[in-house]
Amino acid sequence: MNVKIESSWQQRLQEEFDKPYFEKLVNFVKNEYGKAHILPPGHQIFHVFNSCPFQNVKVVILGQDPYPNPGQYYGICFSVPDGVAIPGSLSNIFKEIHQDLGKPLPNSGNLDRWVKQGVFPMNSVLTVRAHETGSHRNIGWETFTDAVIKKLSEERENLVFMLWGSYAKEKASLIDTDKHLILTAVHPSPRSADYGFFGCKHFSKANTFLRSRGIEEIDW
């Protein structure tokens, strides 16, 4: 199957695109776009892939579902466009960065500047019906994004994987810990951040690891 995606990802994921499950997934999602309000707009489904080539990835942040409210999600996990109110989880991420590294709290929740530096924030599920959280779970996206994680683990070295919350932590089994650093904590959601996300210092730990491997750190 021909999928429009950045060339370095195309090369490594074509095997997935050619599998029967992916064809079923694409047909299901196309049908959904035809009958319901689906997020993000179709051309933004692979936005994080198109913005961060395979060889540029330094830090992987794993999420679960896209934001279900129109105008928020545009293909980058946790991120929202300029001018959109910063969601609670992202606000807590910024608070932890402030506490950890002394960075001022930003006015925008747009994480494009992270992605340009090699941060790869990816949801496990890449589409959702508007206002219906989790509505596109178990249709094939998880199989695809698990393959992405495996490919990064196998073909890259010295990556940092940030796994927040029980769902993301389950993905640790896909990652080679001899080659990569895994950082785990509770989810930054307002419901859980006080129970171990605040104070996790993942952002300084990531930079310390990258520096120790001779890799330029992230300006969080």
Curated annotation (Swiss-Prot):
Query: Under what name is this protein listed?
Result: Uracil-DNA glycosylase 1
Query: Which transformation does this protein catalyse, written as a reaction?
Result: Hydrolyzes single-stranded DNA or mismatched double-stranded DNA and polynucleotides, releasing free uracil
Kindly give the NCBIfam families that the UniProt entry links to this protein. PRK05254.1-1 (NF003588), PRK05254.1-2 (NF003589), PRK05254.1-4 (NF003591), PRK05254.1-5 (NF003592), ung (TIGR00628)
Catalytic residues of the enzyme: 65 (proton acceptor)
In its UniProt record, a GO molecular function of this protein is:
uracil DNA N-glycosylase activity
Organism, as annotated: Bacteroides fragilis (strain ATCC 25285 / DSM 2151 / CCUG 4856 / JCM 11019 / LMG 10263 / NCTC 9343 / Onslow / VPI 2553 / EN-2)
Chief location of this protein within or outside the cell:
cytoplasm
| Gene that this sequence comes from | ung1
Taxonomic superkingdom? Bacteria
Q: Does the keyword Cell wall biogenesis/degradation apply?
A: no
- EC assignment: the record states 3.2.2.27
Localization, UniProt: Cytoplasm
Q: What biological processes does GO assign it?
A: base-excision repair, AP site formation via deaminated base removal
The task this protein performs is described as: Excises uracil residues from the DNA which can arise as a result of misincorporation of dUMP residues by DNA polymerase or due to deamination of cytosine.
Instruction: Cite the Pfam families for this sequence.
Output: UDG (PF03167)
The organism that produces this protein has a lineage beginning with: Bacteria, Pseudomonadati, Bacteroidota, Bacteroidia, Bacteroidales
Q: Name one GO cellular component term.
A: cytoplasm
For this UniProt record, the keywords arranged alphabetically read as follows:
Cytoplasm, DNA damage, DNA repair, Hydrolase
